Every structure is written in C-alpha cells, then in structure tokens.
Amino acid sequence: MSLHLSNVILHQLCKNDQDELVVKLRPASLENDASTENLVAELHRVFHSKAGKGFGSFQSDSEFQFWLQEMRKGERDFYDFSQISANRLKEELIKYPFADEGILVFAEYQSLATDYLFIGILPMNQSLKVTEGLDISATDYLDITKMDIAARIDLSSYETDKESNRYLQYIKGRVGRKVADFFLDFLQADIGLDTKQQNLVLMQAVDDFCADSKLEKQEVNEYKKQVYNYCNEQIKSGEEVQISELSGELPPSQDGTSFMDFTKEQGYELEESFPGDRSTVRKLTKYVGAGGGLNISFDSLLLGERIFYDPETDTLTIKGTPPNLKDQLSRN
C-alpha cells in the first residue's frame, strides 16, 4: 500500500484512582519509521473495511475545525493540535456511558494522493507470548480490528470543497452505543450523506425503470441481478457504487434511455457515487423478512413458481421444501 506518513502520535485514555477518565499525554510525536507507517497503514485498511460508516461535515463555528485549519496552515504544530483535541475528546467522552479506556491515536498521512487525518481509540487486550527462555508471559497488544470509535477526515476533499457533506467519515458503532452522536459532538459536525437512504433510492429507481420499460418478469429478475452483481462487487472491493459506471453495464430501455438518464429525468436525488449497503442491495435478488419467530429468505425468481403469496389471507405457500428442512419437520 502506498502511504506517506506526515505525523502520528499516541495518547492514553485511562482511569485515575477516583475512577475518572483522564488523558495521559505523550511528550512528543512518534518517529516516522517502518513501525509507525505499518500501524497507520493497518488503521487505514481496517477503517476502510468497516461497514456502516456515517458521513458528516463541520458546523461553521466548530472549534475543532478551527484548530485543524491552524495546524494545516502551520500556525499550530501537530503535537499541540493533538493535545488540545485529546482533551476536548475526553471532555465529550465522559458524557457517554461508553467512556472507554484505550490508546488514542492521531495520524496525518497521505494515501493514493489523498490527505487524511485519522482519530481513533484503539482497545488494548492481553495475550501470551513465549520468552527467549521458553517461559510464558503476558503481553499487551492493540486490537485494531475491534476498534469502533474512530473517524477519518478526507483533508483533500475538505480543503477543495468545504460545502461537501461527506469529507468526514466515522464508524457508527454497535447497537446501543451512541458513537455517532459522540463523534459529531466532539468534532462539532452535522450528519452528512445518508448512505442507507441513497441505497433505498437506488432500489426504487431500479424498480421504476423496470416498470417504465415494461419488462417481463424474467427480464426484471435478470436486470436486478445485474445491478446486484455490480453493487456487490463494489462492496467487496471497498469501492463506491458509481451511477454512471452502473448505467454503462445495464441495457437501455426500448426507447434508448439509459438508467442514468432515467434517474436524472425522473428527479431521483442520487449522488454520483456512494457506498453500497449490503443488506439493502441483497433485496434485489431475494425476499427477506423476519419477525414473530420467523426468519424467511428466498430468491425472488421463486415467487410465483414455488412460492406463492395471497395478500387477502396474508398467506405464504411453499411448494417443495428444502430437504434439510423437510427432514426436521418430519421428525416432529
């Protein structure tokens, strides 16, 4: 991975004797060497692979934004920026029930010609190691893959387009942990691009395009399968869904209208590109539902062939149950 490291520093969030969260500040930035470059490269990779990230942009009166601008202009050094930001982060973090201890990392770097600032809290875990004398001893390590409190600012986008609503990305965190609220408060930012909504709009546009083109059922299934295959490949490779690229892979309507032209003519508010949402796009080829003790998923092409739905009686009929399910049912 091509990565150029400008600055990186670690501080520590820990509890004092009064069980209060405090910041233990490192006296200086880390040296830029192979170890720190490998650390930041792994942080970048893991953050990039995390699903369900949110987007945002700074509020006009954001203090953090002001400190960041000073640092980027050379009016404030990176260490001072990290120190003042670490203390602000701690003050916001103690307001939330997940005031975690951990290693706080600030990293300024460039990857693939894009400048980034990464901020994250890395959990510490214990493991075992074998010493040179073949004894067993405990060792602490950074559990980077488990980080769920992290944000990354695309500095290149921010500095060229401050009106953008997506230069700031953050991990939304686990259910019940208001990590999104915490980072928005800490950075003094507002929610930006809604990726879930973008994916839902895309699904609606696909449905409407198929209906407008008067496609037969099999043609609809094939069309949706193409959309799914493209979106799924983008998700797996960590790339965004590009509407123009997707449109180029899809057949036009009978009157020659491309999918992209259709979305523009009909006024769908789709961004040129956005991250795909796996749970949403899978509904292109599957019917999925859960509730009341039931969890049902089946290929959409089976509806009307082996699976039938009667809306009047709200009944789903399955003809030809899977062998493993049939075996379980026959035993009761």
Swiss-Prot record:
Query: Any idea which GO molecular function terms this record carries?
Result: double-stranded DNA binding; single-stranded RNA binding
Its subcellular locations are:
Cytoplasm, Nucleoid
The record ties this protein, via InterPro entries, to: Nucleoid_associated_NdpA (IPR007358)
Keywords tagged on the record: Cytoplasm
Per the record, its GO cellular-component terms are:
bacterial nucleoid; cytoplasm
Q: Which family does it belong to?
A: Belongs to the YejK family.
Q: Which HAMAP family match?
A: NdpA
Database matches in NCBIfam families: PRK00378.1 (NF001557)
Protein name in the entry: Nucleoid-associated protein VP2128
Tell me the organism: Vibrio parahaemolyticus serotype O3:K6 (strain RIMD 2210633)
